[in-house]
């Protein structure tokens, strides 16, 4: 695959991960704490805990709001700079950004709607994706099988091509209008295939095989160095990156 190295944080230093380690998640706050002044980071994470309402207007639970505020408070202990926030257009992703910002005490923030953070980013044919979801054991099975095995090519875009469009054409191309630290709140159906891509298939979210799924506020940190090179780190905002 044509993307940069996957790194892991170990004993105070970054190093290239071994394939056996590449299913681990690093605390998002640790990644921020170890970010160099010349680097930028984009945290692409799933929203916090939601209610049973899965539509666009579904809210976070009270616990979900609390978890996001607590993450913000932990981030504030590292630094006081303002973050950029983007969301998918869904209420629960907006509320995740809002509560992280409030938890870190950021007064001046706007939360920008980013269409490319929609959970259907990888979906080529929505009707076929829904049909497979109904026939093959649910969305967690279908989306993880797609991300890790390339299944359902009639329903989903090519993983590498679509991931590069997201990372390079949407995020990197617009990084100049963002801040040093950026939080983009999205959905599990985007995060799981993206984790599959950025870890060369090693991330521990292969629900179809291992019954592991990405946890709330977990996802990928995209770190952009001063020379323009990029590295990716699976990150967690809660105690564990999977559920």
Report residues per predicted region.
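Short alpha-helix plus adjacent loop in nuclease-associated cores
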Residues: 117-134
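A well-ordered secondary-structure block
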Residues: 168-171, 188
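Extracellular low-complexity, Gly/Ser/Thr-rich intrinsically disordered linkers
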Residues: 163-166, 186
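Intrinsically disordered, low-complexity regulatory regions in eukaryotic proteins
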Residues: 55, 137, 170-171, 177
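Glycine-rich phosphate-binding loop signature in dinucleotide/nucleotide-binding domains
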Residues: 78-80, 173-179
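Beta-strand elements within well-structured catalytic alpha/beta cores of enzymes
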Residues: 40-46, 86-87, 177-190
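Catalytic toxin/effector domains delivered as secreted proteins or via bacterial secretion systems
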Residues: 57, 190-191, 196
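Active-site-proximal alpha-helix that buttresses catalytic centers in soluble enzyme cores
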Residues: 2-121, 139-163, 199-230, 234, ...
């Amino acid at each position: 695959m044509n993307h940069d190295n996957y790194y892991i944080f170990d004993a105070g230093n970054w190093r290239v991960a071994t394939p056996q380690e590449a299913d681990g998640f690093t605390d998002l706050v640790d990644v921020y704490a170890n970010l160099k002044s010349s680097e930028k980071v984009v945290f692409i994470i799933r929203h916090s805990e939601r209610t049973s309402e899965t539509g666009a207007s579904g809210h976070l639970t009270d616990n979900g709001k609390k978890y996001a505020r607590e993450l913000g408070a932990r981030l504030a202990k590292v630094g006081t700079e303002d973050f950029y926030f983007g969301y998918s257009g869904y209420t629960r992703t907006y509320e995740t950004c809002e509560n992280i910002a409030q938890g870190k005490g950021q007064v001046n923030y706007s939360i920008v709607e980013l269409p490319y953070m929609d959970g259907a980013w990888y979906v080529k044919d929505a009707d076929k994706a829904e049909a497979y979801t109904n026939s093959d054991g649910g969305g967690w099975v279908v989306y993880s099988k797609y991300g890790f095995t390339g299944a359902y090519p009639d329903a989903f875009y090519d993983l590498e091509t679509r991931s590069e469009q997201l990372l390079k054409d949407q995020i990197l191309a617009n990084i100049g209008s963002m801040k040093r630290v950026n939080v983009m709140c999205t959905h599990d159906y985007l995060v799981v295939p993206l984790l599959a891509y950025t870890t060369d298939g090693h991330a521990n979210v292969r629900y179809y095989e291992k019954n592991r799924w990405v946890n709330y506020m977990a996802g990928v940190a995209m770190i952009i160095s001063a020379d323009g090179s990029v590295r990716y780190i699976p990150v967690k905002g809660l105690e564990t990156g999977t559920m």
